[in-house]
């Protein structure tokens, strides 16, 4: 899988992800960009799971953002509804971490839209390691959101065999 981490702190929201794509036990590519900007650079999103599935979901999510004039929560709920009820979409295996200046959300294929505690998201195979690292840094340091994301991804990459040290990190100003 992968590791995606999102942290919101001191007027910034950041999502970062590693770049490893695997097929079974083999690393197929080390520089996949699993984090991208959507909706005129007002939303950032990262995916964990199947790459082709995630690109399909990014496309669908961007359409939902357009339909709802960039309203993140409405777009996420509508995507989750479609994902849960459409037979073809139900087969897609991925998780999305999405954020704008106001909200951070996890969108799952089960139709869940989750607003995480403390605006900290960590998904994918390395998610638990990155979450523990990020939480410790949030509680015990004054590091920026970007520094916390980068260091958390490095720690996950040291522990999780499905996470590497090629990072894509995007950030936005945050009101929350």
UniProtKB/Swiss-Prot annotation:
Keywords: Allosteric enzyme, Cytoplasm, Hydrolase, Metal-binding, Protease, Sodium, Threonine protease. One of its GO terms (molecular function) is metal ion binding. Allosterically activated by HslU binding. GO terms for cellular component: HslUV protease complex; proteasome core complex. It is an enzyme of class 3 (hydrolase). It comes from the Bacteria. Signal peptide: none annotated. The active site is at 2. Its EC number is 3.4.25.2. It is found in: Cytoplasm. Pfam families: Proteasome (PF00227). The keyword Cytoplasm applies. It catalyses: ATP-dependent cleavage of peptide bonds with broad specificity. CDD domains: protease_HslV (cd01913). InterPro entries: ATP-dep_Prtase_HsIV_su, Ntn_hydrolases_N, Proteasome_sua/b, Proteasome_suB-type. GO terms for biological process: proteolysis involved in protein catabolic process. Its main location: cytoplasm. Na(+) binds at residues 157, 160, 163. Belongs to the peptidase T1B family. HslV subfamily. A double ring-shaped homohexamer of HslV is capped on each side by a ring-shaped HslU homohexamer. The assembly of the HslU/HslV complex is dependent on binding of ATP. Protease subunit of a proteasome-like degradation complex believed to be a general protein degrading machinery. NCBIfam families: ATP_dep_HslV, PRK05456.1. This is ATP-dependent protease subunit HslV. It comes from Serratia proteamaculans (strain 568).
């Amino acid at each position: 899988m992968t590791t995606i981490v999102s942290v919101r702190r001191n007027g910034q929201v950041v999502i970062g992800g590693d770049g490893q794509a695997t097929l079974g036990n083999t690393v197929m590519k080390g520089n996949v960009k699993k984090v991208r900007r959507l909706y005129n650079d007002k939303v950032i999103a990262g995916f964990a799971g199947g790459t082709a599935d995630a690109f399909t979901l990014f496309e669908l999510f961007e359409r939902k953002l357009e339909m709802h004039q960039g309203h993140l929560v409405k777009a996420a709920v509508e995507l989750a509804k479609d994902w849960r009820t459409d037979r073809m979409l139900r087969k897609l295996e991925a998780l999305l971490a999405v954020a704008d200046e106001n909200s951070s959300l996890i969108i799952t294929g089960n139709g869940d839209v989750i607003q995480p505690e403390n605006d900290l998201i960590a998904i994918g195979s390395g998610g638990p390691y990155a979450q523990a690292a990020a939480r410790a840094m949030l509680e015990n340091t004054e590091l920026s959101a970007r520094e916390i994301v980068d260091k958390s991804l490095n720690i996950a990459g040291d522990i999780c065999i499905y996470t590497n040290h090629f990072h894509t990190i995007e950030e936005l100003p945050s009101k929350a």
